[in-house]
C-alpha cells in the first residue's frame, strides 16, 4: 500500500466541453507539490447527467484546469435507485482536508458519505453495500457494448477491502454493483401512443406512454416512488378509496419471455414478469366490500332464490415487469411480418442465453379508472332504469343519454331493451347468471339486430359482463321483493268497456276469476280480463301469462288437455247445466277447478284487468262492464274458461229459476249454463248437473 496521504475533493466541471452538466469526484495526492493549490487533480470518472437522471460512465481524459469553490446547489447526487440524495458540503478546519459530503439515508436505508480518513495513506469511502465487480476481467469487458445509454461503470485498477469500507488508492476507481446498475436506468418521457384529449386528467398525464382504454387510462412508471406519487394523486383527484384485492405472491422469479400481455401493450421490447401476479385494487364499494347491503337480513332468508348485490366495477391494475430495450425489434407496420418474426426469434434466442446478465429496466404498468367507471356508490339510489315498451332503434346514443338524465344518477351502460329483457327473464324465474347471459345473446343476435348488423361482442351495451348481469338481476329481485310491478302499463292495452250495439253484446275473450271469501256475506273481489278475439297470442299477453305460470306453477299443472264436450238433448237443443257453489270447497279444489276448465289448445288471452264487485247481481239486460252476479254462500267457486265469447239470455224454464247464459268456447258449440240463486230445493252441497260434461278422454267432469 502506498504511503501517501490521500484525500478526496469534490469538484464541478462547468467547461463548455462537457455537455452533460456532470459532476466529478476528483482525486488529489497530497504528496504532490500542487496539493492545496490550484493544480491539476486527477479525476475519478463518475458523472451524473441531470437530463435523464441516470448514472453514466465516462472516462474523462486530461486533468481539470482549476478547482472551484462550490455550494450545495451545484451538485446533483443520486442513489442506486436513481433517487436524489440530500447532502451537505462542509469545509473542515484542517488545511489538509478539502471537503466532506454528508448524505442522508436513501430510500433503502443505505448511506453514501465521503469523509477524510484518520489513517495515513488512504481515503475511506462508504458506499451502498453490494458485491463489486472488476470490469477489467475479459468477461466483464465484453459486456460493455456501445449503446444510446451508457451503462454506469467505472474501471477498477486496484481494490483493497476493509471490514466495513472500501479503500481507494491512487490511480484507482470504484465500480458500482452490476445488478444495481441495470436497475437504475431511467428512460426519458416518451410520447403517448395516441394523442390525448384536452380534458385528460392530470394524473393520467403523469403516466409514461399513456393511452385511454374505455373508461381507464394505462401507462407505466419507472420507479416505485413515481408509482406511489401517481396513485396518491389519482386518489386525491377522484376522491376514491381503494383496497388491495390481489397481491403478487413471493414465488420464484419468472423466466418466460413475452412481447405483450393483458397488462403490458406491445412496443417491440421483450420482457419478463417481475411478479407472479398483478396487483389488483378495487373500490371500497366493490365485491367483498360494501356494495348494496340489504337492510333486513330476514328478507334474504325468506327468498328461495339467490340474491346478488350491486357492486362497483372500478379496478386498478399494476403489473411489474423487466424490459430489455437492447433487444428491441422494429414496430413499423410497413415492415414485412416475416422479417419482424425472425427478429423476434433472434432476440428471444439471445435473451435465453444471456438472461441473467442481460440487464434491463423495471417498469410498473398501471391502469387507472376515471370517475365515470364508478357505479353503485349510493345505497338507496336505484341505478338501473326501468325500460319502456317502445324503443326506437334509430338513435341509440340519444336514447341512452335520455335514460341517464331522467332515471338514475349513475348511468347503466346496458341498452334499455337488454335491461328490459333481463327483467323479463327474471320475472319468468330465470335467475342464473349464465343462463340469463345465454338468453341475452340469442335475443340480441336473433331478435334485436339483423344477422349482418349484430354488434361486436366487446360492445358492453348489448353484451353485458357477468358483473353487470348480476347487478341487474339484483335490481329486478329487489323490485319483486318490494311488490313493485315490473310490467309497464303501456304493455297492457287500455280499459275495454263492454258495450252493446243494437242489443248485441260484443264478441270478446273473457276470463272470470272468483276468489274464495273469508266469511259469509263478505264481498268477493274478482278479476275480469278482456281482449279482442284473435287466432294467436299477442306478445304482451303471452309474456304476462308466462310470468303468472312461473309464480303459481301449481295452478297450471293439473288436467292438461281437457276439453269440454257439450251434450245435446234428443231434439238437438243445447242441454242446460245448473251451477252452484260448494260450501265445502277448499283452495286446493278451487285451484284444480281452474285447470279443469282450461281446455282448448289455443292460448289464453289476457288483457287489461278490471276489478269486479259481487255486490250487484247480473241481469239479462245489464252490460257486463264492472259487475258480476253474486254467487250465494260463503265460499265461491274459482272458475276459468279458455274463450268466453258470448253471453246471452235464454228463456226461463219452469223448473229452473234465475238467468241462463250461453258460453261459446272458440269454434265449438254453445253450452248453456244456468246460475241458480239459492233455491230452497237445493242441498248445501250445491250444484245440480242436468247433463254430464265429458273431457277429451271421455271421463266426466265434476263442477
Curated annotation (Swiss-Prot):
Residue ranges, compositional bias (Polar residues): 23-34
Keywords attached to this entry: Activator, DNA-binding, Nucleus, Transcription, Transcription regulation
Annotated region (Disordered), positions in chain: 1-61, 130-150, 517-539
Locations listed in the record: Nucleus
GO CC terms, sorted: nucleus
Biased composition (Basic and acidic residues): 9-22
Entry comment, domain topic: The N-terminus is necessary for DNA-binding. The C-terminus is necessary for transcriptional activation.
Protein name: Calcium-responsive transcription factor
Species in which this protein is naturally found: Bos taurus
Taxonomic path: Eukaryota, Metazoa, Chordata, Craniata, Vertebrata
Gene: CARF
Amino acid at each position: 500500500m502506498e504511503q501517501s496521504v490521500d484525500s478526496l475533493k469534490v469538484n464541478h466541471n462547468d467547461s463548455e466541453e462537457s455537455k452533460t452538466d456532470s459532476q466529478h469526484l476528483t482525486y488529489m495526492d497530497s504528496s504532490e507539490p500542487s496539493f492545496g493549490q490550484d493544480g491539476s487533480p486527477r479525476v475519478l470518472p463518475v458523472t451524473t447527467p441531470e437530463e435523464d437522471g441516470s448514472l453514466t460512465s465516462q472516462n474523462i481524459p486530461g486533468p481539470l484546469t482549476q478547482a472551484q469553490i462550490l455550494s450545495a446547489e451545484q451538485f446533483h447526487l443520486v442513489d442506486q435507485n436513481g433517487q436524489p440524495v440530500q447532502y451537505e458540503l462542509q469545509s473542515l478546519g484542517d488545511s489538509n482536508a478539502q471537503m466532506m459530503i454528508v448524505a442522508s439515508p436513501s430510500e433503502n436505508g443505505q448511506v453514501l458519505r465521503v469523509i477524510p480518513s484518520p489513517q495515513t495513506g488512504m481515503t475511506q469511502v462508504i458506499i451502498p453495500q453490494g458485491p463489486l465487480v472488476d470490469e477489467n476481467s475479459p468477461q466483464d469487458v465484453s459486456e460493455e457494448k456501445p449503446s444510446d445509454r451508457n451503462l454506469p461503470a467505472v474501471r477498477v485498477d486496484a481494490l483493497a477491502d476493509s471490514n466495513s469500507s472500501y479503500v481507494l488508492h491512487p490511480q484507482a476507481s470504484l465500480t458500482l454493483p452490476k445488478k444495481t446498475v441495470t436497475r437504475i436506468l431511467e428512460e426519458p418521457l416518451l410520447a403517448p401512443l395516441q394523442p390525448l384529449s384536452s380534458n385528460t386528467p392530470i394524473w393520467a398525464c403523469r403516466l409514461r406512454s399513456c393511452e385511454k382504454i374505455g373508461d381507464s387510462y394505462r401507462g407505466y412508471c419507472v420507479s416505485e416512488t413515481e408509482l406511489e406519487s401517481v396513485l396518491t394523486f389519482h386518489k386525491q383527484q377522484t376522491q376514491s378509496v381503494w383496497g388491495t384485492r390481489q397481491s403478487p405472491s413471493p414465488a420464484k422469479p419468472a423466466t418466460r419471455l413475452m412481447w405483450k400481455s393483458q397488462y403490458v401493450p406491445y412496443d417491440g421490447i421483450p420482457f419478463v414478469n417481475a411478479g407472479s401476479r398483478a396487483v389488483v385494487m378495487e373500490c371500497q364499494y366493490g365485491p367483498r366490500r360494501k356494495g348494496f347491503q340489504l337492510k333486513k337480513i330476514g328478507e334474504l332468508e325468506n327468498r328461495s332464490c339467490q340474491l346478488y348485490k350491486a357492486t362497483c366495477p372500478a379496478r386498478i391494475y399494476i403489473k411489474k415487469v423487466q424490459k430489455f430495450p437492447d433487444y428491441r425489434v422494429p414496430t413499423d407496420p410497413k415492415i414485412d411480418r416475416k422479417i419482424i418474426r425472425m427478429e423476434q426469434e433472434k432476440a428471444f434466442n439471445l435473451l435465453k442465453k444471456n438472461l441473467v446478465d442481460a440487464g434491463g429496466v423495471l417498469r410498473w404498468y398501471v391502469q387507472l379508472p376515471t370517475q365515470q367507471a364508478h357505479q353503485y356508490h349510493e345505497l338507496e339510489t336505484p341505478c338501473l332504469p326501468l325500460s319502456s315498451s317502445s324503443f326506437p332503434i334509430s338513435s341509440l346514443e340519444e336514447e341512452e343519454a335520455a335514460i341517464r338524465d331522467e332515471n338514475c344518477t349513475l348511468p347503466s351502460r346496458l341498452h334499455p331493451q337488454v335491461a328490459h329483457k333481463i327483467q323479463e327473464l327474471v320475472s319468468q324465474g330465470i335467475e342464473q347468471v349464465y343462463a340469463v347471459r345465454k338468453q341475452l345473446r340469442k335475443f340480441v343476435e336473433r331478435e334485436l339486430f339483423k344477422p349482418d348488423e349484430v354488434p361486436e361482442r366487446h360492445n358492453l351495451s348489448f353484451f353485458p359482463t357477468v358483473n353487470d348481469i348480476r347487478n341487474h338481476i339484483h335490481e329486478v329481485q329487489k323490485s319483486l321483493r318490494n311488490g313493485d310491478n315490473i310490467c309497464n302499463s303501456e304493455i297492457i292495452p287500455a280499459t275495454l268497456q263492454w258495450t252493446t250495439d243494437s242489443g248485441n253484446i260484443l264478441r270478446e275473450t273473457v276470463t272470470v276469476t272468483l276468489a274464495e271469501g273469508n266469511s259469509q256475506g263478505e264481498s268477493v273481489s274478482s278479476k275480469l280480463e278482456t281482449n279482442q278475439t284473435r287466432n294467436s297470442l299477442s306478445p304482451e299477453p303471452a309474456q304476462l301469462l308466462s310470468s303468472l305460470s312461473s309464480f303459481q306453477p301449481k295452478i297450471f299443472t293439473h288436467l292438461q288437455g281437457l276439453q269440454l264436450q257439450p251434450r245435446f238433448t234428443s231434439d238437438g237443443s243445447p242441454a242446460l247445466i245448473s251451477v252452484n257453489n260448494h260450501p265445502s270447497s277448499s283452495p286446493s279444489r278451487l285451484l284444480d277447478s281452474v285447470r279443469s276448465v282450461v281446455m282448448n289448445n289455443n292460448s289464453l288471452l289476457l288483457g287489461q284487468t278490471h276489478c269486479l264487485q259481487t255486490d250487484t247481481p247480473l241481469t239479462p239486460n245489464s252490460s257486463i262492464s264492472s259487475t258480476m252476479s253474486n254467487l250465494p254462500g260463503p265460499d265461491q267457486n274459482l272458475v276459468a274458461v279458455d274463450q268466453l265469447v258470448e253471453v246471452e239470455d235464454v228463456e226461463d224454464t219452469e223448473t229452473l229459476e234465475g238467468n241462463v247464459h250461453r258460453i261459446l268456447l272458440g269454434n265449438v258449440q254453445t253450452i248453456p249454463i244456468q246460475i241458480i240463486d239459492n233455491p230452497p230445493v237445493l242441498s248445501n252441497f250445491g250444484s245440480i248437473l242436468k247433463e254430464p260434461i265429458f273431457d277429451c278422454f271421455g271421463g266426466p267432469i265434476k263442477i
